[in-house]
């Protein structure tokens, strides 16, 4: 078990940060090592609660799988986010999915969710769809945005 902190907002940035600690000629070996040994990665932000009292954790969760390991090993880090978006049943979650969940639960503001998003346009669209559904069907609506 290895726990560490890095200044990164998501899993892709964390892997990029790890690579930056090594000279470029060692990157392929580092990616191989990560693909074989990384079991999970969690990126967390603490955002202000909509009430102004306290903080709300939003988290990106990357869990190892054969496909994730292949993407890491081959250096195709840009493909990881798509796999995470489609793997919520396995426990994975992107930062943007977490932001939308916290907005739906009334814990963070739309402005805060959009400000902290990896893809502000996707989060803005998710918020708009949720708000339209809530106006049309009442507060019991629960729209999920998945890839």
Write out the residue ranges for each language-model feature.
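Short, flexible helix-loop junctions that flank or precede catalytic/ligand sites
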Residues: 1-147
């Amino acid at each position: 078990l290895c726990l560490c902190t890095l200044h990164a907002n998501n899993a892709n940035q964390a892997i990029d940060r790890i690579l930056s600690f090594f000279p470029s000629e060692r990157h392929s070996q580092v990616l191989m090592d990560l693909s074989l040994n990384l079991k999970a990665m969690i990126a967390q932000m603490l955002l202000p609660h909509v009430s102004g009292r306290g903080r709300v954790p939003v988290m990106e969760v990357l869990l190892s799988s054969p496909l994730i390991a292949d993407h890491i090993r081959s250096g195709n880090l840009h493909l990881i986010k798509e796999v995470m978006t489609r793997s919520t049943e396995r426990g994975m979650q992107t930062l943007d999915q977490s932001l939308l969940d916290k907005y739906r639960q009334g814990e963070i503001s739309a402005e805060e969710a959009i400000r902290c998003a990896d893809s502000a346009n996707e989060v803005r669209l998710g918020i708009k769809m949720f708000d339209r559904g809530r106006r049309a069907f009442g507060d019991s609506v629960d729209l999920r945005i998945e890839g």
